[in-house]
A protein has these predicted regions:
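N-terminal ligand-binding/catalytic initiation module
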Residues: 1-50
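Short, surface-exposed connector motifs at secondary-structure boundaries
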Residues: 5-6, 73-77, 156-159, 177-185
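Short catalytic-loop micro-motif centered on adjacent basic/acidic residues
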Residues: 10, 81-82, 160-163, 185-188
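N-terminal glycine-rich phosphate-binding loop for ADP-containing cofactors
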Residues: 16, 44-54, 182, 199-200, ...
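Flexible loop/turn segments at secondary-structure boundaries
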Residues: 17, 46, 88-90, 111-115, ...
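Conserved helix-loop functional segments at active or binding sites
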Residues: 30, 65-73, 152, 167, ...
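Glycine-rich phosphate/diphosphate-binding loop of Rossmann-like nucleotide-binding domains
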Residues: 40-43, 48-155
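Rossmann-fold NAD(P)-binding glycine/threonine-rich loop
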Residues: 165-205
Length: 205
């Protein structure tokens, strides 16, 4: 009654991955007898998309690349901050690094890591995708990294900021800090990560 191909198509998010979507899809089929496009993020055996895990993070960086080209800039050689450490953040980092960016920070709900030498994504993937650990474990594994508790990732000097964690994570003070520290581009990977005041500050600066 409340979900359907022409009603509402739920997707995974924080704490809800392919397994949980699979459970929901199985129950939907049991109740309706229908095999249709009603949930995104399903496994391939249930009709899911091959690159679903990477799609949002990769797409964010593709969009960023076009945005910068339009303004006579490029991703290569730029210093980047990425909030979050889930699928969107991990694959935004991966694609940004492929484009030649230096990603120096990532975060989770407890704090953030800063690695002046650039984030070692294989270490992050091991921690987050294999061990399901916390981002602070990165600092234990990488001597050049520093872990800081709390929300302070946007105070780090950068060229580009990619908020990929959660809604309203980037507020007015964060926007002012980014601009004061040389950030010239903000591209959003999460759903509405910037507050209205932050967006206004970014657009008028």
């Amino acid at each position: 009654k409340y979900i359907g191909a022409d009603v509402d198509v739920p997707a995974g998010d924080i704490g809800t991955g392919g397994r949980e979507i699979g459970y929901m899809y199985g129950q939907y089929k049991r109740l309706t007898g229908l095999y249709e496009g009603v949930l995104t993020g399903k496994g391939l055996t249930f009709g899911g998309s091959l690159a679903r895990t990477q799609a949002t993070g990769y797409g964010l960086v593709y969009m960023l690349d076009e945005m910068l080209k339009h303004n006579g800039k490029e991703i290569a050689g730029k210093t980047v901050l990425v909030s979050g450490s889930g699928n969107v953040a991990i694959y935004a980092v991966e694609k940004a690094q492929q484009y030649g960016a230096k990603v120096v920070a990532m975060s989770d709900s407890n704090g953030y890591i800063y690695d002046a030498d650039g984030i070692k994504l294989d270490v992050v993937k091991e921690i987050k995708e294999v061990r399901r650990g916390r981002i602070k474990e990165y600092a234990d594994a990488v001597p050049t990294a520093v872990y800081t508790e709390g929300k302070g990732i946007w105070t780090i000097p950068c060229d580009i900021a990619l908020p990929c964690a959660t809604q309203n994570e980037l507020n007015l003070d964060d926007a002012k800090a980014l601009l004061a520290n040389g950030c010239f581009a903000v591209a959003e990977g999460a759903n509405m990560p910037s507050t209205r005041e932050a967006r206004s500050e970014e657009h008028t600066s």
